[in-house]
Amino acid sequence: HLCDRRQRQMCIRDRHKMIRLVTLSTINGGYLNFMGNEFGHPEWIDFPRQGNGWSYKYAHRQWDLVDRNDLKYQYLGAFDEAMIHIISQKKKFERTPIVKLCENDGDQVLAFLRDDLLFVFNFHPFKSFNGYGILAPTGEYEHILSSDDPAFGGYGLIDMKVKHLTRHDPLFEKDNKESVSYTHLTLPT
């Protein structure tokens, strides 16, 4: 089915964006990127050698792919640029601790805090969540990046203007420490 194929391709692009963001947001000093990976280049690099018959076939990058409007590589390139911009604005980001907030294998949801950024990922291949509770430091959270944003090839299911206030839960209040509360989020697949 063409629809199934398109949906599978969308899922692959979304996973590509999230894996790259998880990698970047957990850096510990450096960020390694391979040529063309920033926009999901479809082929590998293989320089001429005896094992490939001294072929030049894969010894190049198709840099024009990211600029072509008839293809989807532009969305991966735009997401890559946006996520790097956000992280680069944080001074000494790599020195800030990663605080795991949620790791739910059944739901395939991962959430962690780094500096003042809350990262939430839904890796489930077909299950979206509405009102998913994440236990986080009490406060207000706003969207600054979403892999679901149409600018990055997403469906636009997240309203980027919505701010999320945490809801206090006394069961999770810690003695003499910053209180934690639930924030409820929509997590599209």
Q: How should each PLM-predicted stretch be described?
A:
Residues 1-8, 12, 184-189:
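Single conserved hydrophobic/aromatic residue that forms the stacking wall/gate
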Residues 5-9, 13-28, 39, 93-96, ...:
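Alpha-amylase-like alpha-glycosidases and glucanotransferases acting on alpha-linked glucans and related
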Residues 5-6, 24-70, 160:
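Aromatic/acidic polysaccharide-binding cleft in carbohydrate-active enzymes
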Residues 9, 13, 64-74, 174-180:
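Active-site rim elements
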Residues 62-99:
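Aromatic- and carboxylate-lined catalytic core of secreted/periplasmic carbohydrate-active enzymes
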Residues 101-136:
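Carbohydrate-binding surface patches
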Residues 126-188:
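C-terminal beta-sandwich/jelly-roll accessory domains of carbohydrate-active enzymes
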